[in-house]
Every structure is written in C-alpha cells, then in structure tokens.
C-alpha cells in the first residue's frame, strides 16, 4: 500500500512559537487576520478546541491578539516556552489547536483513567489488558509552513521490550495510511542498521510496531525509561522508521517525568509528577518533560528556531536556484529562436 503524500490542508491555519510572556496573549499573524478574519466575522470572540478535550474555550480577540481566556487555555494544556501551537480555522471563528513540542513532534497527553478502563483491548493478548496505552492527543495536517510532523516519540518499557511490540499514535498511523491491516516496515537506527518489522492495527483502533523493536533497543543500548523519537521516511516501497534521537550518554539516570494529563472530569487538565516506574504505568509516556531547567527550555527553543531558519533558508535557496535554471532554459530557447530567425532572414535576402 502506498503512503499518502503530504499536501497542504484545506483549512487555513497558522502557527506561533511559545515565547516568554506568552500567558497574557498570543498574536494572530497580520496577513492571516487580514485574509481570513478582518471584515468577515462579527464579534470579538474566538473558540478554541483540542482533540483530547471536548470542552470549547472562549477567548477574547482584541485586534489581532487573543487575550482574555487565553491564559486558562494555556494552563489547561500545559503549554511551555519552546512549544509551538498550530491554529486551524474550521470556520465561524472556531480553531482546532495543536501543540507541538521542541522536538517538532506532537505533544502527547495521557487520557483519564476512566477512559482507560472503558477501552477494550482485543487481539493483543491477555497481558495487555492492564496496560495503559497513551493515545495521541491532537490531530494535525502537515504543510510546508508547519513543524515536521513525520515523527513521533516513544518510551522504552519493560512490557514493550518483553512483547517486542511498541505503540504508534493513532492519528499518526491514520495520516500515513498505516491504521488498517498490516504493513511491512523497516526500523533503522542512526548508524544505518536495519531490522525488518511490520505495523499491525487492531479492532480497538490501536496500532503497533511488531517485531524488531527489542533488537533495535538492545543494539542501541536503550533501557527501560529511555525515550526515543522515530522519523518516518517516505520510501515508495516500504516505509522506514528511522531512530533520530535517543538519550545522551552521561545524562542523569531516570529523572522523574512530568506528563500532560487530562483530568477525569473531561474538562481541564492538570500537571503532576509521575513518580511511578514507566513499566508500572503499563504504557509509554510520550513527549514527557523533565521537571527542571528554564534554561533547558530556552536552549530547546533556540535549537527549534535554528532548525526552522535553516529549513527556510534551504527552501529559499532551492527556489532561487530553480528560478535561475528556468531563466537559463528560457534564455537558451530565445537564443535558438534568434539564430533561426537570423538564418531565415539571411536566406530571404539571398533569394531576393
């Protein structure tokens, strides 16, 4: 089965980085505001919604700034300096909001425990019935202006090592056509070593990488509690999941993790320190954050901004090169036509 190609989403959207002082307001880009909002909608209220919460957040719009109500949305979604937020306009001043972490992956939120108890586990084995699978919280569509959404983060647990089975966020799998049936894939580490594997989907909607996971972790000395990021390489024949980040050598051993967690009420979410071992939780804690260092957040922000600047410069450079090549081809055609016309003119003079 061929993977769907990336394409620009139909819904107009914009993204903004989360910078210091972000809790008081966030700006709508002037160009987006002029094109999609100004003079087209009455009132000064926008509505924000995110996938893990069924609640709609009312936020006041003053000019092209979101102000009153924005702080509550920020705190409910645990947004931090270094994150990016993508606003997708669904019409009638309703925006679906996606949080992107400094690693350029979608931020994952743990579902409420009541949700875990209600969701059935089929075809995965009896041992997985007590396993808490953390689902992807937001659904976004990548485009040329968005962060890289071809990656997702995962944690190593005793359970997924033993079963040689590791989860993939549902929306990620759906985006690339991996959410139905089975698909052959290849796991690749940073050294280029590969392991044959496959993606399996189940009636419950869960999607897993089956096979090769334990071998990859062993070869790369990944241990329980470590986290890693996979990037999907769009191979036309067999999808390749490449390991593109892993814990640095010498890092502090097993710091406490902080998840972004949805409260059981289904409304706001609360931050808390997860002090249990990951294998006791029974599932991966994706895109979790160390509870320390504002300086670390600032470094991640600088790295993320550098990546975007580099990508933008590369695109501009490629665009300039393409334009120059087109000009050269056009000039060559003009020269050819000029020579042909001169030859024709000379031939006409000779006949006269």
From Swiss-Prot:
CDD domains, per the entry: B3_DNA
DNA-binding stretch(es), residue numbering of this chain: 11-103, 151-246
Keywords: DNA-binding, Nucleus, Repeat, Transcription, Transcription regulation
Primary subcellular site in the record, as a coarse category: nucleus
Spans annotated as Disordered: 111-132, 249-299
Record flagged with keyword Glycosyltransferase: no
Compositional bias of kind Polar residues: 287-299
Subcellular localization, as worded in the UniProt entry: Nucleus
InterPro entries: B3_DNA-bd, DNA-bd_pseudobarrel_sf, REM_fam
Residue ranges, compositional bias (Basic and acidic residues): 270-280
PANTHER family recorded: B3 DOMAIN-CONTAINING PROTEIN REM-LIKE 3-RELATED, B3 DOMAIN-CONTAINING PROTEIN REM14-RELATED
Name of the protein described by the UniProt record: B3 domain-containing protein REM5
GO cellular component entries: nucleus
Pfam families listed in its UniProt record: B3 (PF02362)
Domain of life: Eukaryota
A GO molecular-function annotation: DNA binding
